[in-house]
Amino acid sequence: MVKAVAVRGDSKISGTVTFEQADANAPTTVSWNITGHDANAERAFHVHQFGDNTNGCTSAGPHFNPFGKEHGAPEDENRHVGDLGNFKTDAEGNAVGSKQDKLIKLIGAESVLGRTLVIHAGTDDLGRSEHPESKKTGNAGARPACGVIGIAA
């Protein structure tokens, strides 16, 4: 069992996103507990290429995409590895949840360890709109919070 965690960046949004994978062939469970976001909203989160936050969340680079795919929904065959989709917030702007993901890995060559988890200001359109950013970023907006994914105790 490998466990990893990413914590907030520099904004009012805080919380943790944890990753757990039993073995190299198992799906990864992604769990989140996020506070301080917009109330009653769907907000995007993705794993980005670099574990570099020297210039805030901007230096995390594009979505983690080792297979050269277009942006998509977590359940799509054609998607970036880092495409986690959206989470829903409650009336206070908090979100708690989990999902399993077959492409997110903590073990192997395409591991997300050392990369950055970014929480976006907008909703991921899942690559389904006509917006020029849709097939690249999901048109998910700014990056108000992020954290490097590191090995958890």
UniProtKB/Swiss-Prot annotation:
> Which spans does this entry mark as compositional bias, Basic and acidic residues?
68-80, 124-136
Tell me where it resides.
Cytoplasm
Q: How is the cofactor bound?
A: Binds 1 copper ion per subunit. Binds 1 zinc ion per subunit.
Which positions form S-S bridges? C57-C146
Q: What is its EC number?
A: 1.15.1.1
Residues the entry annotates as binding Cu cation: H46, H48, H63, H120
Report the main location listed first in the record.
cytoplasm
Indicate which residues the UniProt annotation says bind substrate: R143
Q: Can you cite an annotated GO cellular component?
A: cytosol
Quaternary form? Homodimer.
Stated role: Destroys radicals which are normally produced within the cells and which are toxic to biological systems.
Record protein name field? Superoxide dismutase [Cu-Zn]
Name the source organism.
Aspergillus flavus
Q: Which gene encodes it?
A: sodC
